[in-house]
Amino acid sequence: MEVKDANAALLSNYEVFQLLTDLKEQRKESGKNKHSAGQQNLNAITYETLKYISKTPCRNQSPAIVQEFLTAMKSHKLTKAEKLQLLNHRPMTAVEIQLMVEESEERLTEEQIEALLHTVTSILPAGPEDEQSKSTSNDVAMEEEEPA
């Protein structure tokens, strides 16, 4: 197999999630069965990819949120790949941002990192794991407050 253009387009997890969800719905509606081995492989890959991606923050994103995020990111001097990583992973700490932004020590001040972190957390919705860990920590806090 020959790769014609390796960087034809970069897709966010949200775009892949939407594409695979739509594909799954189309196949359900058309009633195509899993006859060929290739079809079974495609179904397995689609299932595993959707299973993984549904655990990421992209599950709660929408086209409007993605557009708002990209508009807000214009003021930050980041590459397309760095913006894509921020969109896909929704970092919650300065350390996570420093890991995603190449040469962040030279390119960004602490104030810029904090501003970037604020932009990311205020625009992008939390992922399923973030919500679950938040509810778990709230449950623990409530148990500690109740007298035994």
From Swiss-Prot:
Residues 124-148 are annotated as: Disordered. GO terms for molecular function: calcitonin gene-related peptide receptor activity; DNA-directed RNA polymerase activity; nucleotide binding. Coiled coil: none annotated. Ubiquitous. Most prevalent in testis. The keyword Signal does not apply. One of its GO terms (biological process) is neuropeptide signaling pathway. It comes from the Eukaryota. Its main location: nucleus. It is a peripheral membrane protein. InterPro entries: HRDC-like_sf, RNA_pol_Rpb4/RPC9_core, Rpb4/RPC9, Rpb4/RPC9_sf, RPC9. Keywords: Antiviral defense, Cell membrane, DNA-directed RNA polymerase, Immunity, Innate immunity, Membrane, Nucleus, Transcription. DNA-dependent RNA polymerase catalyzes the transcription of DNA into RNA using the four ribonucleoside triphosphates as substrates. Specific peripheric component of RNA polymerase III (Pol III) which synthesizes small non-coding RNAs including 5S rRNA, snRNAs, tRNAs and miRNAs from at least 500 distinct genomic loci. With POLR3H/RPC8 forms a mobile stalk that protrudes from Pol III core and functions primarily in transcription initiation. Pol III plays a key role in sensing and limiting infection by intracellular bacteria and DNA viruses. Belongs to the eukaryotic RPC9 RNA polymerase subunit family. Component of the RNA polymerase III complex consisting of 17 subunits: a ten-subunit horseshoe-shaped catalytic core composed of POLR3A/RPC1, POLR3B/RPC2, POLR1C/RPAC1, POLR1D/RPAC2, POLR3K/RPC10, POLR2E/RPABC1, POLR2F/RPABC2, POLR2H/RPABC3, POLR2K/RPABC4 and POLR2L/RPABC5; a mobile stalk composed of two subunits POLR3H/RPC8 and CRCP/RPC9, protruding from the core and functioning primarily in transcription initiation; and additional subunits homologous to general transcription factors of the RNA polymerase II machinery, POLR3C/RPC3-POLR3F/RPC6-POLR3G/RPC7 heterotrimer required for transcription initiation and POLR3D/RPC4-POLR3E/RPC5 heterodimer involved in both transcription initiation and termination. This is DNA-directed RNA polymerase III subunit RPC9.
